[in-house]
Amino acid sequence: MPMKSLRNDHGTLKAMIGSDFNELTIAAKNLATHAFTLTGLGFGTSVLEWVASIAAIYLLVLDRTNWKTNMLTSLLIPYIFFSLPSLIFGIFRGEIGKWIAFVAVVVQLFFPKHAREYLELPVALVLLAVVAPNLIAGTFRDSWIGLAICLGIGCYLLQEHIRASGGFRNAFTKANGISNTVGIICLVVFPVWALIF
């Protein structure tokens, strides 16, 4: 259609501009919907990462107090290593972690009677974060391999906890079983969510 005839036909011009604006509106809505969906999934994964790390630390502390469990809590150290949020992991991997590791080694070497048994696993976590090669601390930790390790540890701990409680029902009815069961379920939910989404 020649330009001169378009200038005279305002109805066609309005229809074309209206059509373009409708297409832009639909594209903007799709962009907003997709951005919200992706951000929402990322936000959910981030929140679950924090919840799983806090649950693992809670279970680690719980085992070192009077509420002893039959869990193999040393497995929580690699779980925390692979699921710790990047902000905290970066702190432990940096200068602060090096100083904590240095003080822990000095205390263990020169004052072995003052080094408490309940500090062994947290110090092992900091040492692991400080000395782990970049392949493990960066590549494996931020990939599906780290999530698969977390999922394996979480499933194993859940199975052992249910077995030690005497069944699935007893895991929720014993006095301290509820908190342990909910904590271990959090350990399983995070890697499943992160692997799916």
UniProtKB/Swiss-Prot annotation:
The gene is COR413PM1. GO terms for cellular component: plant-type vacuole; plasma membrane. The chain crosses the membrane at residues 41-61, 72-92, 95-115, 118-138, 142-162, 177-197. PANTHER family: COLD-REGULATED 413 PLASMA MEMBRANE PROTEIN 1-RELATED, COLD-REGULATED 413 PLASMA MEMBRANE PROTEIN 2. Keywords: Membrane, Transmembrane, Transmembrane helix. It is a multi-pass membrane protein. It is found in: Membrane. One of its GO terms (biological process) is cellular response to water deprivation. Residues 1-40, 93-94, 139-141 are extracellular. Its main location: membrane. InterPro entries: COR413. Belongs to the Cold-regulated 413 protein family. The keyword Transmembrane applies. It comes from Arabidopsis thaliana (Mouse-ear cress). This is Cold-regulated 413 plasma membrane protein 1. The keyword Hydrolase does not apply. Induction: Accumulates in response to abscisic acid (ABA), freezing and drought treatments. Residues 62-71, 116-117, 163-176 are cytoplasmic.
